[in-house]
Amino acid sequence: MKVKVSFLFIITLLQLWINPITSQAEGVSIGVIVPEESEYLNHSQLNRLQTKLEQIVSAGGISAMSNAYFVLYPVFEINESSLVEGGMKNIAMVNASLTLFIRQLDNSMIVNSISLDVKGTGFNKGEALVNALTSIKPYSNEFKQF
């Protein structure tokens, strides 16, 4: 009887020790937050950015949920924008920085961040911005480490 009780006690302790480890690995979810308005991006471009961010989170094997403990949010800034004249049509060029932050909601601590430069071209600034957002590759090695 004494052996059975100690055996059950050891099994119970092992279950308590193993379960939190597996639930932490499987239960991670990150919410994606994109501002409703931006100085640089219009509503359609913000939707495109949100889709890219959700793809980045999903590509990492983490679920993208709106009610998550962690949030991923972007800071998008245009560093340089120019219009190259010549030929039959002018070409707009945009060099921008996209910084992604993962923040813990309960204490606002930044857990991780990554910054990358994106470039785009088009017949106007709007098309160049869309091209810059399209150049973000969710499955790239930069995001695998992020």
Which role fits each region the language model picked out?
Residues 1-6:
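Positively charged n-region of N-terminal signal peptides that target proteins for export
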Residues 42-50, 89-96, 122-129:
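Solvent-exposed, acidic/flexible segments
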Residues 109-146:
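C-terminal/domain-edge helix-coil "capping" segments
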